[in-house]
Amino acid sequence: MAERANLVFHNKVIDGTAIKRLISRLIDHFGMAYTSHILDQVKTLGFQQATATSISLGIDDLLTIPSKGWLVQDAEQQSWILEKHHHYGNVHAVEKLRQSIEIWYATSEYLRQEMNPNFRMTDPFNPVHMMSFSGARGNASQVHQLVGMRGLMSDPQGQMIDLPIQSNLREGLSLTEYIISCYGARKGVVDTAVRTSDAGYLTRRLVEVVQHIVVRRTDCGTIRGISVSPRNKNRMMSERIFIQTLIGRVLADDIYIGSRCVAFRNQDLGIGLVNRLITFGTQSISIRTPFTCRSTSWICRLCYGRSPTHGDLVELGEAVGIIAGQSIGEPGTQLTLRTFHTGGVFTGGTAEHVRAPYSGKIKFNEDLVHPTRTRHGHPAFLCYIDLSVIIESEDIIHSVTIPPKSFLLVQNDQYVESEQVIAEIREGTYTFHFKERVRKYIYSDSEGEMHWSTDVSHAPEFTYSNVHLLPKTSHLWILSGGSCGSSLIFFSIHKDQDQMNIPFLSVERKSISSLSVNNDQVSQKVLSSDFADQTKFGIPDYSEFKGNLGTSHYNFIYSAIFHENSDLLAKRRRNRFLIPFQSIQEQEKEFIPHSGISIEIPINGIFRRNSIFAFFDDPRYRRKSSGILKYGTPKADSIIQKADMIEYRGVQKFKTKYEMKVDRFFFIPEEVHILPESSAIMVQNYSIIGVDTRLALNIRSQVGGLIRVERKKKRIELKIFSGDIHFPDKTDKISRHSGILIPPGRGKKNSKESKKFQNWIYVQRITPTKKKFFVLVRPVATYEIADSINLATLFPQDLFREKDNIQLRVFNYILYGNSKPTQGISDTSIQLVRTCLVLNWDQDNKNSSLEEVRAFFVEVSTKGLIRDFIRIGLVKSHISYIRKRNNSRDSGLISADHMNPFYSISPKAGILQQSLRQNHGTIRMFLNRNKESQSLLILSSSNCFRMGPFNHLKYHNVINQSITKNPLITIKNSSGPLGTATQISNFYSFLPLLTYNKISLIKYLKLDNLKYIFQVINSYLIDENGKIFNLDPYSNVVLNPFKLNWYFLHQNYHHNYCEETSTIISLGQLFCENVCIAKKEPHLKSGQVLIVQRDSVVIRSAKPYLATPGAKVHGHYREILYEGDTLVTFIYEKSRSGDITQGLPKVEQVLEVRSIDSISLNLEKRIKGWNKCITRILGIPWGFLIGAELTIVQSRISLVNKIQKVYRSQGVQIHNRHIEIIVRQITSKVLVSEEGMSNVFLPGELIGLLRAERTGRALEESICYRAVLLGITRASLNTQSFISEASFQETARVLAKAALRGRIDWLKGLKENVVLGGVIPAGTGFNKGLVHCSRQHTNILLEKKTKNLSLFEGDMRDILFYHREFCDSAISKSAFSRI
């Protein structure tokens, strides 16, 4: 009884895990027999209690957790806020998806954790609780779905559905939730069956790889070991995993504490010894593993260690390979099935949070951090090195060190509350996530014009296409607007480069036909006073405009200030300036357009290398009608594939430019009508119509032919194909083909139709029904692409004397893809081919650091003529100059540093008439021969002259200009359908004034250098060239500068003058929704400011889309996008590390060594790098041996870690040695390379590493090889036994190959003996199956061998493998980067 009194009494509920530990300790203390007796008693007790309790399970026992209601409500609130942020353009689609998933996953997990305490408190004897939490039936996840919430589902592809199932199975699912639940098909009958078969097949493959691994010796005599340490450079290994790794292993070396040996070599490690070693604080323990065993076809007892069944060293003859395969494959059916995106809660502690220990003010060094965004789109600072963060409170100062590559979530001098998250620590680089690169396409929600608010660079692989890369986080804007049909508007003011064909326009005895308006011909004339009465010049005065437009169609974007019956429609194509080289002649009061070169300047005036500088639309390649383009090399009735195109292969919805090297292309005309969805169509599909047939209410056909009706998103397309219909015979070859071009003279000679084959024809097969078909023979227009445009015809020869600096190259583009339709609204022409000039400089000077040049518009006055020119600055310094004009009061200024000098002043009438007759020119900047002074070179097609260096220049602060009268019609203060006029009250009238320091003025404030008192201007309208136009006809002040800000001053600020200002609004400014101009005023909608008036602003509504660096933007600046067009592509990495979808694909992908993502690719790249570098450093044969061995060690450890990580995340414990046996087999081969041809092995042959070493030593010649990672399937088909391979898969092929090669099977494995009915060489048949030398003889051989070890075999291996650093993959990686 005294003995019993010393025992500790435990009154504790124990679950399945605790029982496992108890049984393990009982076996250690009492042995197997006594333990089984104890467990028998436990079993009997359990059955007795269960019978007495008589637990039954009813639906009433499923109790929903009370806190679920407010948890779900909180999650919905967060999701709603997130949706708002996305709408305002603060987060993009990927960040929204990540955060949404994280919110719901956190809610679901919290509910799961609440479940157990809730049951314990409310109903501890609840049958569901007792069954699931004792481990008898069901698990936490299943009960969570019954009483918590089902949570997030994944679809069959493993993608997360971001709409969670909020109900649980007790409450029942709604219809939507039921469909999502079926779609996910998790934990269902189908899914279980699929998982079971997957896991079974995985087990079969694993067993196939290692079935021949049997314990055949006691000691292989290896001197190597793998070093295990509880802490290393990257991380702390948890004590539990450290103990699990050590127990059951055998020491590879003696362990000393000081000078005392506490454990000796070849001693197996039990729990007592491991605890003692941990207590002593041993830094590193070298153990033997299957990796260090000296044979690949068997294993020794000491390298394997203890048998998991009885706790002693494994017996000879035990088939440990099959046990290993079963151990890894069997848990596959138990794994839970979820998939999550990167981020905190999904991957099991991806990000740890640092919280403030108490309230206080944060202080840190701002120079050591870099502003960035977190994966959820929140602003943060990224630390590059260890950062010390100080938290100051009233009585204490606390310092926290943030490690590198962590996010700091607070600002300097910010006050933080206690327990507030201040930083997020990223995990070390040692972990291996299963990531895959996913593309997320963002589509446009509305129709409009594309605009972006930052510099966007071309993707290098798509230099001349419309795929752009974003260098920094910015917004993409879709400015609202639409394609405007006929009879909607009366007239429009054209701005820069708004090209339009106006077929008919009558204005009181004056007519303008085929007017193509370019540059600022209209804008300068209409908006300057000098042309108020010069209607004879061809510009109508609006007051006497009484004309009507004929059947004109406009194909352009209209802006937000358009409303029905409005007086003014302005098209905004802001900030992209196109100046044409175009001569304008006055002949009988008509403008005659000439096709010329248009120079294209980016928004910020900066050219990068190889950017398109100008383009030329050749009128020969213009078509009035719609049609299809075909090109390639026509050959034997077919079109060969596309030639040398630069095309983005991802999404084909947008218009790409193709750089072509073809000499001809074909245009197949067709008539196209696009109608609204609700239109009444008066023709049937596949019917044949004549000319002038009525198609819809107000549309008639212009050509006859076969009609095709296609219904697309929100519109109907009518296509009319002209041509001949041919009903083919069976003998007709032509009917077999569809969509081909046939050259002249290829028709049937004796037929009546031979005369129609004089030109190229296009044959198209039409199938109205399944049985009937006929062939449509359509006419084709053939275009030959002439030689490239000659630069000498555009510029005089002597202009390019300074060719050392700037080069212009010519490229031809086909603007439409092969077989792509070209659509044009009627009466507008379609340009098929565009010739582009590409700008480059400093070609010969490879070291030139000038990656971009700046282009400016300048005005140059010579002999009274004033011209606008472009200047391209190749020198980084700037030139400023002043030009005097007739009016001595006025002065103009251009400076490169302070503002974007896009700037033009309307000259007097006589000067304008002269300048209109001249061509526009271009100014380029060059360095003179002496490389010291700069000069401007003016390129003009009429004349050229040089202006010398500009020195001693002055400039003023204020630019102003007086215009006597401005006959513009004012815009009404009403909001159109696409724009918003917002009233702005409570501020004083403002005076616009440009200085280099932004100063806001109120009415009575004057500055010293202001000579004239400005009148108060009511409203301004922005112009393309940055001119600000006053819409008040009685005001005589117009300001010129490009950037002009308005400061709205509130009433209570008028005493403080410039000290405090409210919102600044600039013309042309883009801003997101929810920006408030003044207190208690309505929020602005997102858009672009078009007009600023005294009490309101007119905004063109726009939709912002946030995009982060690296996103690919599809489309060009100002391109018209329709609803549903692809706008941007995000490429992001999705992590699926902690979870497994439908069976075991992740473990399987590691074991099959598939390149699933960047991680596996990194491993393969690292292997290749090691092989190259080691060989280069150490030479042959050392390099091959050491390179292969180091590679193999490195990859083995990382593979074991990756597989263990997946299983541990699911709570499945597998001993490392099982995984090591599998990994050893898939990493034991090397590939013979072609670098050094040997007489023994063929290049490309797979051989064992040990065999390669021994053969090389025996032949004394170098064999070139490199390490490879084989998958388990490939390893199964590359064994020493062809019978084993043939019984696995591809039986006929394997046996045929083996017969041809004359292979011999030595029947060493288990499987081949089973197939042939022999004795299995394992277990009791171990000694019968194989003949062995005596034990004593083996030892003698080993001793002799050890004595004769060369330096190469012994010392070198010791140096490389005995120490920890070469075995650890992470350290190997750093060593590789240093090499």
UniProtKB/Swiss-Prot annotation:
Subcellular location: Plastid, Chloroplast
Keywords per UniProt: Chloroplast, DNA-directed RNA polymerase, Metal-binding, Nucleotidyltransferase, Plastid, Transcription, Transferase, Zinc
Necessary cofactors: Zn(2+)
Gene Ontology biological process terms in this record: DNA-templated transcription
Classification via InterPro entries: DNA-dir_RpoC2_beta_pp, RNA_pol_beta''_euk, RNA_pol_Rpb1_3_sf, RNA_pol_Rpb1_4, RNA_pol_Rpb1_5, Rpb1_funnel_sf
GO MF terms, alphabetically ordered: DNA binding; DNA-directed RNA polymerase activity; zinc ion binding
Catalytic activity reported: RNA(n) + a ribonucleoside 5'-triphosphate = RNA(n+1) + diphosphate
Cofactor comment text: Binds 1 Zn(2+) ion per subunit.
Function: DNA-dependent RNA polymerase catalyzes the transcription of DNA into RNA using the four ribonucleoside triphosphates as substrates.
Quaternary data: In plastids the minimal PEP RNA polymerase catalytic core is composed of four subunits: alpha, beta, beta', and beta''. When a (nuclear-encoded) sigma factor is associated with the core the holoenzyme is formed, which can initiate transcription.
NCBIfam families hit by this protein: rpoC2_cyan
Family classification: Belongs to the RNA polymerase beta' chain family. RpoC2 subfamily.
Name of this chain's protein: DNA-directed RNA polymerase subunit beta''
Organism encoding this protein: Olimarabidopsis pumila (Dwarf rocket)
